[in-house]
Structure formats: C-alpha cells, structure tokens
C-alpha cells in the first residue's frame, strides 16, 4: 500500500516513472497486488492527470483514493487522496459514511490516508485521531516523514506512519533509518513490523576552518567500511578562509 507521495514532485522525470513502473510490474508478475492514493506531491496545481494514474490504467497498481471501499481477499480497503486543511470540514460526512459502510464487515478493514494527525505532530497536524472513522483495524498513513505508531482507545486499530523511504531535501541531512511496515493481519489485530531499508547513508559535520583537516580524517575513518558511498555535508566556520584549501581537503573524500 502506497499512502501518497509516490513521487517527490508532480512531474517526475522519465527515469523515475519507468523505474516505478518496472517495480510495480515485478510485483504484479509475482502475484503481489498494490494499491495507492495521492499525496500533495502527486497533485499538480495545474489541473492535469496525476502521473501515478498511469500505473492504474496499465493494471500495475490499483488507485483507491476516491473514498470507495473495495473488498480484496477478505479485507476491506478504503482510501482518500490528500485533503487540504481548509477542506477538512467537508469530509466529516465522508468519514461518517466510511465508518458505517465497514462497521459490519467481519474481516480486517484498512484506511489509507495522507494526512498529519495532531497527536503525532502538532505543527503538521490537520486533524485529530478522534476525527477518524473508528471502525478500521489499521490506519495506513502517509505525509509525515518519520516513523511512528500509536494506538488509541477510541480506534479499533493502530495508526502507523512508516515515513518516507528516503531522506528528502525538506528533511535535511541527518543520521536516520528509513523503511516500511509489513503488517501481520493473520489474527484479530493488525500488527505492524518494521522493515529497515538499506538506504544511502547521510552525515552532517560541523567544524572550525583550522580543524578541517582533522575533521576530514575523522570522516574518512567513519565512512571507510560503508558499502554505499554516503552523502556528506560539512559546515565550516572561521576567518580568513581559503577556498583552495577547502577544496583540497574535501577532495580527500572522493
């Protein structure tokens, strides 16, 4: 399940579109179905067909962002595309109808949203957990970039944010693990298990200009055993800085 922001921009380059298509095709060829909704990064401000629709039309993945529940292998899945905060009040009835439509369904019920929940991030919050339909057994969430899972007494299942699968420019460079959730629904409860991805390491270092050579040595030691070349950010402070000296030191990292 892709909970929105399949791409980082509404108009990704051709390589990204093909790579994603090939990956979804591989899933399909191995009898693994996938589902997706749209996040704000998938939706252009200019009215045009979102790129991910290509995968739905080709049969590689199924679009479920229209709020209509579908039954799949004994599971009920429903999703909604990104809702702007200013439009949230219009969706109260939609949430209520979703709740009623799945209430008597005996199997697991999954709701896919691309929203910020205030209890997870008060600055990015667009709705409270109490605003959500209460009868779903798993809430697959997109939008927030950090991993987090919470269970609330008023909901029948956990709210799970796997976060982004790669650091983005808005997050800056930091040492953080990325991954996704594999959810066990063999029992009455949905149990998310964290699967860590082998992403490219990213490090940020602060140094005084006079200590740059020493800092570069420390960086070389830190990254010497990595299998993937990392992304390195070096913040340098000082006076009478010579750019040639900086370039010579940074070149040691190549």
Regions found by a protein language model. Give the residues of each.
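His/Asp/Glu-rich metal-coordinating catalytic cores
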Residues: 10-177, 181-184
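Short, glycine-rich nucleotide/cofactor-binding loops
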Residues: 7-15, 209-211, 226
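Short acidic, S/G/P-rich loop/turn micro-motifs used as interaction or catalytic elements
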Residues: 7, 84, 118, 239-244
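Active-site beta-strand/loop signature of hydrolases that rely on acidic residues for catalysis
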Residues: 1-8, 39, 234
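Intrinsic structural disorder
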Residues: 1, 27-31, 107, 215-217, ...
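Accessory, non-catalytic peripheral segments of nucleic-acid enzymes
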Residues: 185-254
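Conserved beta-strand positions
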Residues: 2, 113, 141, 234-236
